Design a protein with these regions (language model features):
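C-terminal interaction appendages of subunits in large macromolecular complexes
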Residues: 1, 5-144
C-alpha cells in the first residue's frame, strides 16, 4: 500500500525530493519539505478522473527514469526533465500513451550501478538496452 511508500522520518524527508508517477503517465517531483505539516494525513498529489498512483519514490541518487506500459512500451529519460511542483499540482505528462495503454512499472537508474534486469515476456530483459529518449514521447517496443 502507498501508506507505507515513504518509510522515512520527516526530518530526513525534508532533505530529499519525492517523485510521483501515475498510470496515466502524469508525474512530478515535490520537495520533501512540502510534507512537513501538522496534520497526520495530507493529500500528496492531485489525480485526474480514473487515474491512480503507480510509484512514489524518495529521490536520492537516481539518474534516469524508465516507464513500462501495459502494452509493452518503454521510455527512458533523465529525471532532470521532470519539473519540481507543489504537492497540490497534477504534474506533467511523462509518456504519450495510446488507446487504453497505461504505465504499469517504473524503474530507475543510478550512476555507477548496472541498470535493472527485469522479467519481460517471460524472459530476462536488461533495461540498459533502452536508449535514452525525451519526456513526453511515445517510447519504444523492444524485441525480446
Amino acid at each position: 500500500s502507498l501508506h507505507d511508500a515513504l518509510p522515512i522520518c520527516q526530518t530526513s524527508l525534508n532533505l530529499y525530493r519525492v517523485i510521483f508517477v501515475t498510470k496515466l503517465s502524469m508525474m512530478k517531483i515535490v520537495d520533501g519539505g512540502e510534507f512537513d505539516v501538522s496534520k497526520r494525513m495530507v493529500a500528496s498529489t492531485k489525480l485526474q478522473e480514473g487515474d491512480e498512483i503507480v510509484d512514489v519514490s524518495v529521490l536520492k541518487e537516481q539518474k534516469d527514469i524508465i516507464l513500462q506500459t501495459k502494452d509493452g512500451y518503454f521510455l527512458k529519460f533523465s529525471l532532470e526533465e521532470i519539473p519540481e511542483k507543489k504537492k497540490g499540482a497534477v504534474g506533467v505528462r511523462g509518456m504519450k500513451l495510446t488507446g487504453t495503454d497505461q504505465v504499469e512499472n517504473v524503474y530507475y537508474t543510478r550512476p555507477g550501478m548496472a541498470d535493472p534486469v527485469i522479467e519481460f515476456k517471460e524472459k530476462q530483459f536488461d533495461l540498459s538496452r533502452i536508449k535514452t529518449g525525451r519526456r513526453d514521447s511515445k517510447g519504444t517496443k523492444p524485441r525480446v
